[in-house]
Amino acid sequence: MTIIRKKHPLIKIINHSFIDLPAPSNISSWWNFGSLLGLCLIIQILTGLFLAMHYTSDTSTAFSSVTHICRDVNYGWLIRYMHANGASMFFICLFLHVGRGMYYGSYNMIETWNMGIILLFAVMATAFMGYVLPWGQMSFWGATVITNLLSAIPYIGTTLVEWIWGGFSVDKATLTRFFAFHFILPFIITALVFVHLLFLHETGSNNPTGLNSDADKIPFHPYYTIKDFLGVLILLMGLMILVLFFPDVLGDPDNYTPANPLNTPAHIKPEWYFLFAYAILRSIPNKLGGVLALILSILVLALLPLLHTSKQRGLTFRPITQTMYWILVADLLILTWIGGQPVEYPFIIIGQMASIAYFTIIIILMPMAGMIENNILDLD
């Protein structure tokens, strides 16, 4: 078996990536989320494949086909809710994975980090298009509002929006193409994940100390396969509790009403995992400014390697920047709450202040804190 594992041209790639991979001996449970994201992707692709067998991407039957899946297909309700809540688990793992990368300075592995940002954009695009497919009220109006943002692009904006819609409004053509893209993107994401891993294995994993761990490596299997398996069990337990006991807790009741272009919902809002970005978008009165802020809210992550001023890699031994980091986490929670609130006083001003704080902490305060810590520790 050892001979096959190390000699076979295909199996040896798997061996070098998941079995004999030298890993730091001290990586904590925060390093579990990469494998959990892989699991989430597999769950989403499998459940999505079975949903696609019964779904019809036509405006007149889309809503009914989702109802049919839940009522008439064997375990259709389970597949549908695993897919919907699986997306939420996917984003929870994504945010924790990115947060861990920010905390421990993993963004200094620039190729891996930038590939991760591309993956984040791809997953967000996939989730957005998936939310449109059930063709409920929030699906339709969410698609209308978000695609309409592209009309803010000077000169070509309106033409671009109509091109994406395939007409003069969100209609049958839009739904059909969103289904096509929603189906193909996860496979593109899977390919990008392998590129992400390729870049990661060029440098090796970071660790909680931020120090070079070449002198103290252990094989990935059995140590981290067992550790990842515990994470998998916890994730699956959390997902199944959500699916079997609270399947609709993260959804919007408006999406149980079929799409009606003549009736606008009182509060148009995306799924919970987009609310922080939606709050940043709404906090700027100018349409183009809001769109730019929305894109920059994610793209600002690409600036982190350039904004790294500290002589230390992670935040493990940096209390001032740690404080800034946790204020940023609290700020993101505030933005998520504001994104789900109506556009009125006092939510408008809270959203604007939280949006300013978000960019200020990342671009100004954290780099400044790094320089202060260098001076305190005489690391200059």
Curated annotation (Swiss-Prot):
Substitution effect: residue 23 to T: In strain: Isolate AF 3221
The protein's required cofactors: heme b
One Pfam assignment: Cytochrome_B
PROSITE patterns: CYTB_CTER, CYTB_NTER
Protein keywords: Electron transport, Heme, Iron, Membrane, Metal-binding, Mitochondrion, Mitochondrion inner membrane, Respiratory chain, Transmembrane, Transmembrane helix, Transport, Ubiquinone
Binding site for a ubiquinone: 201
Transmembrane spans: 33-53, 77-98, 113-133, 178-198, 226-246, 288-308, 320-340, 347-367
Primary residence: mitochondrion
Cofactor binding remark: Binds 2 heme b groups non-covalently.
Subcellular location field: Mitochondrion inner membrane
Chain positions recorded as heme b b566 binding sites: 97, 196
Job of this protein: Component of the ubiquinol-cytochrome c reductase complex (complex III or cytochrome b-c1 complex) that is part of the mitochondrial respiratory chain. The b-c1 complex mediates electron transfer from ubiquinol to cytochrome c. Contributes to the generation of a proton gradient across the mitochondrial membrane that is then used for ATP synthesis.
Alphabetized PANTHER family for the sequence: CYTOCHROME B
Further details from the record: Heme 1 (or BL or b562) is low-potential and absorbs at about 562 nm, and heme 2 (or BH or b566) is high-potential and absorbs at about 566 nm.
Binding partners and assembly: The cytochrome bc1 complex contains 11 subunits: 3 respiratory subunits (MT-CYB, CYC1 and UQCRFS1), 2 core proteins (UQCRC1 and UQCRC2) and 6 low-molecular weight proteins (UQCRH/QCR6, UQCRB/QCR7, UQCRQ/QCR8, UQCR10/QCR9, UQCR11/QCR10 and a cleavage product of UQCRFS1). This cytochrome bc1 complex then forms a dimer.
Similarity-based family: Belongs to the cytochrome b family.
Name of the protein described by the UniProt record: Cytochrome b
Source species: Myodes gapperi (Southern red-backed vole)
